[in-house]
C-alpha cells in the first residue's frame, strides 16, 4: 500500500494483515481525497478506527498538521506506530481504546474525522452522535461503511455532501 499524494507521495506503508481490519485500498483512498480535497483545510485529523493508519497518514501527507490514530486492536495500532515512525511523522498520537471510550476521554476539536468501523457496526447515527462534539465548526466527517448500511441525509447541523460506492463499500461525507 502506498501514499497517493502530498509530501509523502509514493511512500510505501505496511498493512495490518488482520482479518478484522479492512484496509482502504489505494484507488478508493485516492478517490476519497479527490472528493474532499477542495474543502480540505486540516489542522487536526482523527482516524477513529485506524487500522494501518493509511487514511490519517494520507491526510498528514496532504497538509494535516497533527493526526490522532485510534484502534481497539493492539496489533493494528503497532502497525500505525511503525508506519508513522518509518515515514518520519512526529506529530501523531496513538490510542488503543474502544471508540466510545476514546470519545468520552477526548476533548480536542478535529477538522477531519475519519470513520471506517467494522461493517457489522451498522448503527451509523449512534457513531455520528458519539463523535459529533469532537468536530470543529467547519469540520468534515468521512464515513466508510458497507454498501447496505443506512445513513441519514442530515444529522443535527451536518449535511451529507457526498455519497459514493466502491464495490462493497460506501463512502459518505458530512460537512458542518
Predicted regions located by residue number:
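Class I S-adenosyl-L-methionine-dependent methyltransferase catalytic core
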Residues: 1-176
